[in-house]
Design a protein with these regions (language model features):
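Histidine/acidic residue-rich metal-binding segments in metalloenzymes
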Residues: 148, 199-219, 223-295, 325-344
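Bacterial N-terminal signal peptides
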Residues: 7-21
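Active-site gating loops and adjacent loop-to-helix segments of metal-dependent hydrolytic enzymes
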Residues: 100-117, 126, 173-188, 223-237, ...
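His/Asp/Glu-enriched, well-ordered alpha-helical/loop segment
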Residues: 111, 249, 318, 324-411
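Histidine-rich, glycine-flanked metal-binding segment
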Residues: 26-30, 41, 46-88
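Histidine/acidic-residue-rich catalytic or RNA/ligand-binding cores of hydrolases
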Residues: 102-105, 225-227, 264-270, 300-315, ...
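Divalent metal-dependent hydrolysis catalytic cores, especially in the metallo-beta-lactamase
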Residues: 120-146, 160-169, 212-225, 253, ...
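Metal-associated gating/positioning segment near the N- to mid-region
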Residues: 85-157, 173-176, 180-183, 238, ...
Length: 433
């Protein structure tokens, strides 16, 4: 019966295949054409700002970009006048937790089911997209809530950014990625816990099985977890090599949460694709990152929120105390890493602070060493490269998705203008105007 079913299915598919050319032709003929007149356009590839540009969009993708004076506008196209604004590619945040709520820190989180958290994600996704972030990498969520959210957005059920998802973050028992808030008699162990190289390999396979696009690991302790020091290494080099080897074999990149110098060094030596936080990175770590081409994703805005709102948000007293020690060091080391030649991608750790405020980080990236253009590039072409999506997003280029935003000011002069996004388009559809 199985083979009979397959043969019938094959026959149906063949019949459909014969009709596909006409379907494709009809779809192409009916694709909506939109034309954007841009007063200024940020060319993130060249690092320049172009004046009086016209962008032609057919369906989801960009089909033409060039000077307005010579642009050919298709008959019947929908016109969008942004001639008084600056247009740039949709932004990308490489470190989000869309299913987390900033005001449910510490023990408050124990009252939230994974299902409820996934519903927070629906709200957070919309806020993030409306803020101009058209793609995100979500690096940890319970119950594979981020995977479900990604799929729902892709299927058109909800509005949100393009998502690369990790599922559960993987770490050692008792470490930053474990569940450490409950006492011993409850015997609660986090779903992402894996000790030793072979357990770690198996956990990578599990994450991939259930839909993770990227593998997130905890190489060191953390600020917001109970009972561990941010600078203390947790995974060994051997364990991280096993994780990276398995993940890369399965076509997944690896992001390593690492605050301490030794954990950063071993994560880079193990071959991770990015190091998150990098708070206590030293000269050796910067040199290794530069030589290996490892991206650093440093969240240097949320220190403000933790110190100002952490107690109100329910964060543990020990977490606030740790942040007081590590926050400014991370910002200073951001400058050292950037000037030392390490590749940087924008990542803000949204969910630690309220979603939609992602762009507040730009001001700190500029304060600690970047030009506005370099900060924008970190959130566009650099982030797209780290995602493995350079062919899809990250610049306003022919063939890429029409993920486009606009602001009334000039973000290339002051990237902090990106906190005031006035226009958002994702895949040719206007989300905010």
């Amino acid at each position: 019966m199985k083979f009979k079913h397959l043969s019938v299915t094959a026959a149906v598919l063949c019949a459909l295949g014969a009709a596909l050319p006409s379907f494709a032709a009809d779809a192409k003929a009916e694709a909506k054409v939109v034309v954007i007149r841009a007063g200024k356009l940020v060319d993130v590839v060249a690092g320049t700002v172009l004046k009086d540009q016209t962008i032609v969009i057919t369906g989801e993708r960009i089909t033409s970009v060039g000077p307005s004076a010579s642009a050919k506008v298709p008959a019947g196209a929908q016109m969008i006048d942004l001639s008084s604004q600056t247009v740039l590619p949709g932004l990308i945040d490489m470190h989000t937790h869309l299913t987390s709520d900033a005001y449910l820190g510490g023990y408050n989180a124990l009252g939230v089911s994974d299902t409820r958290a996934a519903l927070y994600g629906v709200r957070s996704a919309r806020k993030t997209l409306e803020a101009g972030f058209t793609s995100v990498r979500n690096v940890g969520a319970g119950g594979f809530g981020d995977v479900a959210l990604r799929d729902a957005i892709n299927e058109g059920d909800f509005i949100g950014p393009r998502m690369s998802t990790a599922g559960y973050a993987i770490g050692i028992q008792g470490g930053h990625c474990d569940e450490n808030l409950l006492p011993a008699d409850k015997n609660v162990v986090g779903r992402g816990v894996a000790d030793g190289p072979w357990e770690a390999r198996a956990k990578v396979r599990e994450m991939a099985k259930y839909g993770a696009d990227v593998i997130k690991i905890c190489a060191s302790g953390g600020v917001l977890s109970k009972g561990n020091e941010p600078g203390a290494q947790q995974y060994t080099l051997e364990e991280m090599q096993a994780i990276v080897g398995e993940a890369h074999k399965l076509g997944r990149k690896v992001a390593a949460h690492a605050h301490g110098a030794s954990s950063i060094r071993d994560a880079i030596l193990a071959g991770v694709d990015s190091v998150e936080h990098s708070s206590l990175i030293d000269e050796e770590g910067i040199k290794l990152a530069r030589e290996k081409g490892t991206y650093l994703v440093m969240d240097i805005y949320n220190d403000d929120f933790i110190l100002q709102e952490g107690e109100k948000a329910g964060m543990l007293p020990e977490s606030i105390a740790k942040e007081k020690v590590i926050g400014q060091l991370q910002r200073d080391n951001f400058r050292k890493a950037f000037t030392g030649g390490a590749k940087m991608a924008f990542g803000s750790d949204s969910g630690v602070y309220p979603h939609g405020d992602n762009a507040k980080q730009f001001a700190y990236m500029i304060k600690y060493g970047m030009t506005s253009m370099q900060a924008i590039q970190a959130a566009t072409i650099n982030a797209a490269d780290l995602l493995g999506w350079k062919d899809r997003v990250g610049s306003i280029s022919v063939g890429k998705f029409a993920d486009i935003i606009a602001v009334k000011g000039d973000p290339a002069e002051n990237a902090a203008e990106l906190t005031k996004v006035s226009f958002v388009m994702k895949g040719g559809e206007v989300i905010r105007r």
